[in-house]
Amino acid sequence: MRNASCKRVTGETDISMELNLDGTGCAAVATGHAFFDHMLDLLARHSLMDLTLQARGDLEVDAHHTVEDVGIVLGECIKNALGDKKGIVRYGCSYLPMDETLTRVVMDLSNRPYVAFRIPEGGLPDAPNFPLTLCEEFCRALANNLRCNLHVEVLYGRDGHHIAESVFKGIAHALRQAAAIDPRAAGTLPSTKGML
């Protein structure tokens, strides 16, 4: 089983997390921010990882620190659960529709962190109490700590809730593909360099 647990305590947040990459998509998430909890539940459900998360943050200021730090811890936990990455597919790609919204997510579990987060020129609407900039901060924290290459592009959309949901579900499906074990590649790294 590929599982891990991580903890992060700062002056702004206190986060404990356990995850199983080879789960069934069960989530028990409590961040104090209902919309963010909903997004994390979707991420667990669609990636099929089991996720237990308790987070306390300075939500009286805003959700930024909580969202960013949860992304940091989730990235660390997934990286730890992946271990040496032998046998993984490594790459994942998802086009995720959510009603009028379409988002493309491409991931490479390369050990080379990079994030591209793009939205259409002119901007997009925010979800209630969850600005689109928080989606970007989450992606950046996740990718930098998972040490993956992550490209997220919201191709179009009109509803802020649908846009955020398509981003989180898109990440889930790309991660599910990239982290999957390919039995034909058992015991080998998906790299001609011999390392990731």
UniProtKB/Swiss-Prot annotation:
EC no. given is 4.2.1.19
* Disulfide-linked positions: none
What is one process in the GO biological process aspect for this record? L-histidine biosynthetic process
| GO cellular component terms listed in the entry, alphabetical order | cytoplasm
Q: Where in the cell is it found?
A: Cytoplasm
Its pathway is:
Amino-acid biosynthesis; L-histidine biosynthesis; L-histidine from 5-phospho-alpha-D-ribose 1-diphosphate: step 6/9
InterPro entries annotated for this entry?
IGPD_sf, ImidazoleglycerolP_deHydtase, ImidazoleglycerP_deHydtase_CS, Ribosomal_Su5_D2-typ_SF
Q: Does the keyword Amino-acid biosynthesis apply?
A: yes
Any one Gene Ontology MF annotation carried by this entry is: imidazoleglycerol-phosphate dehydratase activity
SUPFAM superfamilies for this protein? Ribosomal protein S5 domain 2-like
Which HAMAP family does the protein's record reference? Answer: HisB
The family annotation for this protein states: Belongs to the imidazoleglycerol-phosphate dehydratase family.
Name this protein carries in UniProt:
Imidazoleglycerol-phosphate dehydratase
Species name for this entry?
Answer: Akkermansia muciniphila (strain ATCC BAA-835 / DSM 22959 / JCM 33894 / BCRC 81048 / CCUG 64013 / CIP 107961 / Muc)
Q: Which gene encodes it?
A: hisB
